Amino acid sequence: MLSTFEDILERDGRLVYTNVGTSMMPLLRERRDLMVIEKKGPERLHWLDVPLFKRDNGQYVLHRVMWVRKSDYVICGDNQWYLERGITDKHILGVLTQVDRDGKVLDMRSPKMRLYGLLEWLSYPLRACWLIGRSVPGAVVRRVKRYKMRHHAAA
């Protein structure tokens, strides 16, 4: 029987895993870096923490806390522009505490990695403009192609 992330965190107190996806690049390289995620305690998350959470649709996500609000968190991937709101403590399973990369250990609580998180946070407005700007031309091209296909098919 396969164990869920929740089962592993409950049993062992931590989860060691590789990531799938590019939303946390360059911090996490897809299928290359090992993540150590520790089970979340009763305390609230802190600004710039990187929690593992489970969306209401069952999808597991690891993104950075951009803002801590009274009843929820605003979370975003380091390589994303979309701010996800409404993530509450009930969604949070654990927090990224360590990244093992090419034999080097990156402690997420170290001053160096906290500074890295701060720089990611500060760069968010520029990153959002860049990523949105890159996606708009592609979306326009796709719409034009669909429009042409519909009108050629009708002719």
Question: What residue spans do the PLM features occupy?
Answer:
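Extended hydrophobic leader/signal-anchor segments used for secretion and membrane insertion
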Residues: M1-A155
